[in-house]
Amino acid sequence: MRRIAVVGAAGRMGKTLIEAVQQAPGAGLTAAVDRPDSTLVGADAGELAALGRIGVPLSDDLAKVMDEFDVLIDFTHPSVTLKNLAFCRKAGKAMIIGTTGFSAEEKQRLVEAGKDIPIVFAANFSIGVNLCLKLLDTAARVLGDEVDIEITEAHHRHKVDAPSGTALRMGEVVANALGRDLEKVAVYGREGQTGARDRQTIGFATIRAGDVVGDHTVLFAADGERVEITHKASSRMTFAKGAVRAAMWLDGKAPGLYDMQDVLGLH
């Protein structure tokens, strides 16, 4: 059995991950961790996820359960994830990282850790989103510089980073396909007298409202026609199942920093 730990286990995504782990053949939840000030510490992780008792108590310290898992799934916050990364690197434990909002410097720390342990890091673990990334690469190469490119995304009111990591990843894929540097061509929102649009730019627009799980659309607009590639998530379970699939795929893999394109064989 693949022994899996979930950090942030008492949160919305954490509970969904617990359910996904318990549903996956050959996988089992053997550790669950949440923040030290959580009032739920000591509770059964299965009961937190409405699955019934599974005999895995919620811990407040990852260091206490390092011997109880093979791979850690972390969808928390950059500062928390980096601390957990240090523990896993020292202990030789694999990691699945779905946290977004990392700076360029913080992402480099993931690269360095990948020299010692196997890691799957992705802005989005949905199989559909990763298929969209493949389609975006093709669309950008075919349509080239003859289109204006705009990326819109919508998420629930609780999401703390914008644009979403998925939207930024989509922008990176498109920019790379066109030989552009996203940092130089990205435009984040528009207001006032902006002047005529520069076709080399890639625009981003963000919506935060209600309980939207995650909508992403990339628009390729030419004179006379438009192409839109859209993904809409209706449940967090799609991300959780992808993360568990990645955790199973990492079994026996050499140290390295992988992504979902590797897991799905889309590279």
From Swiss-Prot:
- For this protein, the Enzyme Commission number is 1.17.1.8
Identify the residues that bind NAD(+): 8-13, 34, 98-100, 122-125
Q: Which UniProt keywords apply?
A: Amino-acid biosynthesis, Cytoplasm, Diaminopimelate biosynthesis, Lysine biosynthesis, NAD, NADP, Oxidoreductase
This protein's pathway reads: Amino-acid biosynthesis; L-lysine biosynthesis via DAP pathway; (S)-tetrahydrodipicolinate from L-aspartate: step 4/4
Q: Which InterPro entries match?
A: DapB_C, DapB_N, DapB_N_CS, DHDPR_bac, NAD(P)-bd_dom_sf
Sequence positions that bind NADP(+): 35
Enzymatic reactions: (S)-2,3,4,5-tetrahydrodipicolinate + NAD(+) + H2O = (2S,4S)-4-hydroxy-2,3,4,5-tetrahydrodipicolinate + NADH + H(+); (S)-2,3,4,5-tetrahydrodipicolinate + NADP(+) + H2O = (2S,4S)-4-hydroxy-2,3,4,5-tetrahydrodipicolinate + NADPH + H(+)
Catalytic residues (positions): 155, 159
Q: Which GO terms describe its biological process?
A: diaminopimelate biosynthetic process; lysine biosynthetic process via diaminopimelate
Annotated residues for binding of (S)-2,3,4,5-tetrahydrodipicolinate? 156, 165-166
Its Gene Ontology molecular function terms?
Answer: 4-hydroxy-tetrahydrodipicolinate reductase; NAD binding; NADP binding; oxidoreductase activity, acting on CH or CH2 groups, NAD or NADP as acceptor
Please state where this protein is localized: Cytoplasm
Which range is the signal sequence, renumbered to this chain? Answer: none
* Primary location: cytoplasm
Q: What class of enzyme is it?
A: oxidoreductase
User: Per the record, GO CC terms?
Assistant: cytosol
Q: What Pfam families does this protein map onto?
A: DapB_C, DapB_N
Q: Which NCBIfam families match?
A: dapB
UniProt family annotation: Belongs to the DapB family.
Q: Tell me, what does this protein do in biology?
A: Catalyzes the conversion of 4-hydroxy-tetrahydrodipicolinate (HTPA) to tetrahydrodipicolinate.
Protein name from the UniProt record: 4-hydroxy-tetrahydrodipicolinate reductase
Q: What is the lineage of its organism?
A: Bacteria, Pseudomonadati, Pseudomonadota, Gammaproteobacteria, Pseudomonadales
Give the encoding gene's name.
dapB
